[in-house]
């Protein structure tokens, strides 16, 4: 087999693995397949709660009363809106994180079905008008008194915002039976968390949002919600998107996932058996970023005194996380010098190429030496074409005598695959790349594909006209041609097809990939072209000497 065929096959193998990787990523992660959890940790709903399962199937939508008022609360990081009907949080905007329309991202909002992202159901108590009272700048109470079945209750919801600009809200529930000599008479209440986090741009497209999912962290494992799954005493349960999430932590909680109106909801079930009840929920509502999540693992790092909550486990870590950490560090160093994440990706690419340059140089030299052996190789192939075993033996003997490694030219190509996959995960999980502009007006966000025109509908499975995939395809073709040691005219039909076919296949596979990933690929191609010219000149000078 000729050296160029080996290299082309290595590239083809790389293409195959990239395609498989993209498909697996889309199937396993973007869709959050429920098969992730094979062994479920269950509790018996009837035994533990002594209630009718049919109660879980009730309609949890609520209509805001005409007498309801909106209460707006502002902190340095949040703009929150509460409704006095139900005392629910109906909108929560992140002031420091803007969407593509340059407006605060709304992480909690009312849905057309009159559902908030999370709310509490307590029979008639949940559908009452509450009185609002501001305790201080960070603590806000909603109170109501109501009669249920001849019994009178005082119901208080207390929302406490962080004084240290942490993305956490403490929700306290107080339920007091005014008839002190009587039991509460309510068996349980539910905290409902639905799949409602979205970011919409003016174009009407979901942004930064390659999945909407429920997750639960239990027994040191991250698991994904599915209909019918119930777990006792998890660390937290949450709903999230690519870059934002809402996580709920509570002591001794029991969680059930159930489809309601084709939407997966998580129900935190809480049994009541006292005359007076108080409960506490800690609700993280903010970026899916360890910078903000991990402070709740040590009580001295957060104003709520929380520890070992493990919110940071919601950020998935791939098998190549050990590569992503130094890559992220290198990007951060370059960004500190030149505050542009697009340039940081380009510099990271150059660093990677420099690190593997010794292998690349040896690879190219091995390919050149193999090209010189073509006459001898063809002679052996003709001589022993009817004896495959002897043919392989003679080829191996020739390689040993000439000191040539026949697969040496493949190593740099295959070595780049882990780097590519690691960067793919980094671009999808590195929060600072969200909304990071490289070239304003063209590449406005490195975490999504570039776009010069939005159709508003799908055209051949595409919604946008993008430029970077075309640049990638052209530079990939040039890189392949320059890396070859033979003239294009001498190539066979199959090799010509591989030369042109693979860049085109890469074009289709990577068309909708984040622009940060394509910048890495394009920079790699351009660097490879320049590098190959340098190597050829260097080898030419050595021959002349």
Swiss-Prot record:
* Cellular-component GO terms for this entry: plasma membrane
| InterPro entries membership | Membr_insert_YidC, Membr_insert_YidC_N, YidC/ALB3/OXA1/COX18, YidC/Oxa/ALB_C, YidC_ALB_C, YidC_periplasmic_sf
- Segments passing through the bilayer: 10-30, 319-339, 341-361, 407-427, 467-487, 502-522
One Pfam family, please name it.
Answer: YidC_periplas
Location relative to the cell = Cell inner membrane
For membrane topology, the record states: Multi-pass membrane protein
Does this UniProt record's set of keywords contain Protein transport? Answer: yes
Spell out the CDD domains in the cross-references.
5TM_YidC_Alb3, EcYidC-like_peri
Q: Does the keyword Transmembrane apply?
A: yes
> Tell me, what does this protein do in biology?
Required for the insertion and/or proper folding and/or complex formation of integral membrane proteins into the membrane. Involved in integration of membrane proteins that insert both dependently and independently of the Sec translocase complex, as well as at least some lipoproteins. Aids folding of multispanning membrane proteins.
What PANTHER family has UniProt attached to this entry? CYTOCHROME C OXIDASE ASSEMBLY PROTEIN COX18, MITOCHONDRIAL (PTHR12428:SF65), OXA1 (PTHR12428)
Q: What does the record note on quaternary structure?
A: Interacts with the Sec translocase complex via SecD. Specifically interacts with transmembrane segments of nascent integral membrane proteins during membrane integration.
Q: Which family does it belong to?
A: Belongs to the OXA1/ALB3/YidC family. Type 1 subfamily.
What is this protein called in UniProt? Membrane protein insertase YidC
Q: Which organism is it from?
A: Borrelia duttonii (strain Ly)
């Amino acid at each position: 087999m000729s050296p160029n065929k080996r290299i082309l096959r290595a590239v083809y193998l790389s293409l195959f693995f990239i395609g498989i990787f993209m498909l697996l990523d889309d199937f396993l992660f973007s869709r959050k397949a429920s098969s992730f959890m094979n062994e479920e940790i269950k509790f018996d709903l009837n035994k533990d709660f002594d209630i009718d399962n049919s109660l879980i199937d009730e309609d949890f939508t609520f209509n805001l009363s005409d007498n309801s008022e909106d209460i707006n609360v502002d902190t340095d990081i949040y703009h929150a809106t509460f409704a006095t009907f139900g005392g629910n949080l109906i909108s929560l905007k992140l002031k420091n994180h803007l969407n593509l329309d340059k407006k605060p991202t709304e992480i909690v909002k009312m849905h057309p079905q009159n559902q908030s992202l999370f709310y509490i159901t307590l029979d008639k108590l949940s559908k009452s008008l509450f009185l609002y009272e501001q305790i201080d700048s960070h603590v806000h109470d909603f109170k109501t008194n109501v009669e249920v079945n001849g019994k009178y209750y005082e119901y208080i919801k207390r929302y406490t915002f962080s004084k240290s600009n942490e993305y956490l809200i403490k929700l306290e529930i107080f339920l007091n039976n005014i008839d002190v000599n009587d039991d509460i008479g309510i068996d349980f209440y539910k905290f409902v968390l639905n799949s409602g986090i979205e970011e919409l741009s003016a174009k009407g497209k979901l942004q930064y949002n390659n999945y909407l999912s429920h997750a639960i962290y239990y027994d040191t494992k991250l698991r994904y919600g599915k209909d019918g799954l119930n777990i006792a005493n998890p660390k937290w349960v949450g709903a999230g998107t690519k870059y934002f999430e809402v996580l709920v932590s509570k002591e001794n909680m029991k969680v059930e996932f159930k489809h309601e109106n084709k939407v997966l909801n998580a129900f935190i079930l809480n049994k009541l058996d006292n005359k007076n009840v108080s409960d506490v929920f800690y609700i993280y509502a903010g970026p899916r970023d360890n910078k903000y999540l991990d402070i709740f693992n040590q009580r001295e790092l957060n104003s709520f005194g929380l520890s070992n909550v493990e919110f940071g486990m919601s950020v998935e870590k791939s098998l190549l996380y050990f590569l992503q950490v130094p890559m992220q560090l290198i990007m951060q160093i370059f960004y500190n010098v030149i505050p542009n994440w697009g340039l940081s990706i380009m510099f990271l690419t150059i660093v990677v190429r420099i690190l593997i340059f010794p292998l690349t140089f040896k690879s190219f030299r091995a390919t050149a030496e193999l090209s010189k052996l073509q006459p001898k190789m063809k002679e052996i192939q003709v001589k022993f074409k009817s004896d495959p075993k002897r043919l392989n033996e003679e080829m191996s003997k020739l390689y040993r005598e000439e000191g040539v490694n026949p697969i040496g030219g493949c190593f740099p190509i295959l070595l780049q695959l882990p780097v590519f996959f690691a960067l793919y995960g980094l671009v999808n999980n590195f929060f600072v790349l969200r909304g990071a502009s490289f070239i304003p007006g063209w590449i406005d966000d490195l975490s999504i594909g570039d776009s010069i025109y939005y159709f508003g509908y799908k055209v051949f499975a595409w919604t946008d006209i993008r430029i970077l995939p075309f640049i990638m395809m052209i530079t990939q073709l040039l890189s392949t041609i320059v890396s070859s040691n033979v003239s294009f005219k001498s190539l066979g039909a199959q090799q010509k097809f591989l030369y042109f076919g693979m860049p085109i296949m890469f074009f289709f596979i990577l068309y909708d990939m984040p622009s940060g990933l394509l910048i890495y690929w394009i920079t790699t191609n351009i660097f490879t072209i320049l590098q190959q010219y340098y190597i050829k000149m260097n080898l030419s000078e050595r021959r002349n000497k």
